[in-house]
Amino acid sequence: MGKPILLLPLGLSLLMSSLLALQCFRCESLDSTGLCRVGRRICQTYPDEICAWVVVTTRDGKFVYGNQSCAECIGTTVEHGSLIISTNCCSATPFCNMVHP
C-alpha cells in the first residue's frame, strides 16, 4: 500500500514540470525568408531554458544563416569579422521564436 502513495507525488511532479515547460520551434537551418529548410521540429524547454533563435547576417544586412531552438539563452549581438551574429530569446508565449526576417 505504501508504493502507490509514493508514486503519487512523483507523478504530480512530472505533470507540473510538463505543464510549466515551454514549447518552441526547433530548426537546424532557416532560409532568408524564415522558412525551415533542415530539421524542422518542436522542442520543449527544460528548467533554465527558453525559446531562442540565432540570425547571422553580413554587415550590409544580407542573410547568411539562422536557427531556432530551446536553450539557455542570453540575447546578444556580436560582430565577428564581416558578420553580425544576433542571439534572441523569448519566453512570453509558446512558439515565440518564430523568425520574421
UniProtKB/Swiss-Prot annotation:
Processing and modification events after translation: N-glycosylated.
Cross-referenced InterPro entries: LY6_UPA_recep-like
Superkingdom of origin: Eukaryota
Record carries keyword Iron: no
Primary location group: secreted
Annotated signal peptide: 1-21
Name of one Pfam family that matches: UPAR_LY6
Protein name: Urinary protein 1
Glycosylation sites: 67
Cysteines engaged in disulfide bonds, as pairs: 24-51, 27-36, 43-70, 73-89, 90-96
